Amino acid sequence: MPVDWFGYVYAATVAAGGIMGYAKAGSIPSLGAGLAFGALLGYGAHLNSQDTPRPLLQLGTSLFLAGLMGARWNRSGKLMPAGMVCMLSVAALVKNLATYNRYLMPAGTKAP
């Protein structure tokens, strides 16, 4: 499989958002969450770049971020940062489901 550039950029964007949250507001939870989710997404992009992609980590992390930030966006009504991360996470979900759908199989089946 080719390198999952979208996944790596998505991971870097989430991590950079956490760093920006810390730099602007001194938010240590934002820094921790941004770096943790960025690391998970980066490792997920690495798994997607293997000969047999394994998209579940990136899909699960994207789904969790979309839900978490979507709820935050709904409460605050502010596009930045919650709305932007929610939309980016939904885009990552759609892209990964479209790209890696044949690698999402029930347990006990073999990869193509």
From Swiss-Prot:
One of its GO terms (molecular function) is transmembrane transporter activity. It holds the Pfam family Tmemb_14. It is a single-pass membrane protein. It is found in: Membrane. Keywords: Membrane, Transmembrane, Transmembrane helix. The keyword Transmembrane helix applies. One of its GO terms (cellular component) is mitochondrial membrane. The chain crosses the membrane at residues 3-23. GO terms for biological process: regulation of heme biosynthetic process. PANTHER family: TRANSMEMBRANE PROTEIN 14 HOMOLOG, TRANSMEMBRANE PROTEIN 14, 15. Belongs to the TMEM14 family. This is Transmembrane protein 14 homolog. It comes from Drosophila melanogaster.
